[in-house]
Amino acid sequence: MARIVLKIDVDTLRGTREGVPNLARIFDRFSARATFLFSLGPDHTGWALRRVFRPGFLKKVSRTSVVEHYGVKQLMYGVLLPGPDIGRRAIADMRAIHEAGFECGIHTWDHVYWQDNVRMRDRDWTAREMQKSHARFIDIFGAPPVTHGAAGWQMNDAAFEQIDAWGMRYASDGRGHSPYLPVVGGRTLSHVQMPTTLPTLDEVLGIDGIDTHNVAAHILKFTETNPHDQVFTLHAELEGQKLAPVFEQLLAGWRAQGHTFATMGDYHATLDRDSLPSYPVTWGEIPGRSGELIVQPD
């Protein structure tokens, strides 16, 4: 029926070392193509605890069992333990995924630092953070990255412009309903934004009686009779670990519905850029997620 683009955000050292290879094995069993987006610098997961005073944050973490999914040690990075350098400590794990034939791209340099700061930062700060991740990616993989997917769907105008400056043809930095060309400062950029179109597991778990036993069926309702291509974002720390059985149910369900699995690059190759609409960079809220993020206007 349609393509399901599988986009994996890798936020942490543990996710890179444990969740990523677990997902690779799952994808092999399903003959599924996918795109891995890596965090390439320090793991400061513990800094996220400062979000406790943000509206909706406590409600979200109470639904998704943060300690169970991330582990106590992981939550101490940047608080009681120094943040390990993911790109140094897990270089072999990242290279193995690339060598296995999966598409790889940039998620961020420092996940929590980017997510909590980028919206209000200037062009110089943004360029420094993005160039660190770009240089590290080349160090690890020996070639420039082809795509980008922002941490927490958080960006600013300069970040979108940097994607153009890198020569990337496509990225997935927000939420929405279909591919489009982003407009910044009245100027239409060159790269295509392919937003996440489906809800993530952690956004629906714990809502209206949805749990690990029925969440796959809930997500599958969005694609049961929908002929349009979709972008699904998953996390190495969730679907690659405790939620792996649920994710396998999703993959089996999508295959039974007649869908195929694709990388971001596969999806981009099917698009006619000249026919795509343009939309200004916009912020908004998504059910099940605290705070504002990049959204595609309706």
Language model: regions and residue ranges:
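Short, glycine-/Ser/Thr-/acidic-enriched flexible segments
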Residues: P199, E237-E239
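Catalytic alpha-helical scaffold of carbohydrate-active enzymes acting on polysaccharides/glycoconjugates
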Residues: M1-T147, G152-V192, I210-F232, E239-D298
